[in-house]
């Protein structure tokens, strides 16, 4: 996953300490990309945000609490709703270039996607999260097909799909990109 908390020792405090350290050392904008799923329960605003029903409002609440905890105007927090693999749903057909013979499974993923407004809303359940759905589609029920390579496939699909498609299909992702572009326009990079 893209959760720095797992990389930084499993606690939000380790993430904040590292983030503050980077911000002190640099004079540029600093950002993050963490998955909403599996945020540590010591993440700022955790209890409050998890009581918010609307998923977009919930993730924004987390980002605001993260921004406040870091305490720098040069920090642009981003938490992916629900996980990075939601962006892969913008280009499901590209998975077929890596994983031949999965056409029926990819069609099932497209059907899942058609039931929601956009890829960011594909799921709100860790058991059937975007990555879990993709893994099941690629590896099969009994894992007799491919071994799904999340980093490689995610990078491949994102490059093939392109930034404009990701932005047009994923509103929360787009708002993050707009904030980064505004920072560039202000000369803060």
Regions found by a protein language model. Give the residues of each.
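A short beta-strand-loop structural module common to alpha/beta enzyme folds
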Residues: 1-9
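Ligand-binding grooves and catalytic loops that recognize ribose/phosphate and carbohydrate rings
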Residues: 8-17
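C-terminal accessory helical subdomains adjacent to catalytic cores in phosphodiester-
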Residues: 16-189
């Amino acid at each position: 996953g893209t959760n720095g908390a797992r990389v930084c020792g499993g606690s939000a405090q380790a993430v904040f300490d590292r983030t503050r350290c980077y911000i002190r050392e640099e004079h540029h904008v600093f950002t993050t990309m963490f998955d909403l799923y599996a945020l540590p329960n010591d993440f700022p605003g955790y209890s409050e945000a998890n009581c918010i029903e609307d998923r977009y409002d919930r993730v924004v609440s987390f980002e605001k609490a993260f921004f406040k905890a870091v305490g720098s105007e040069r920090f642009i927090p981003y938490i992916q709703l629900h996980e990075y693999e939601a962006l892969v749903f913008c280009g499901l057909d590209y998975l077929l270039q890596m994983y031949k013979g999965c056409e029926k499974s990819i069609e099932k993923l497209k059907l899942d996607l058609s039931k929601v407004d956009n890829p960011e809303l594909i799921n709100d359940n860790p058991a059937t999260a975007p990555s879990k759905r993709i893994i099941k589609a690629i590896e099969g029920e009994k894992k007799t097909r491919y071994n799904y390579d999340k980093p490689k496939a995610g990078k491949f699909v994102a490059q093939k799909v392109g930034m404009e498609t990701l932005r047009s299909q994923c509103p929360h992702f787009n708002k993050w990109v707009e904030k980064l572009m505004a920072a560039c326009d202000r000369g803060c990079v």
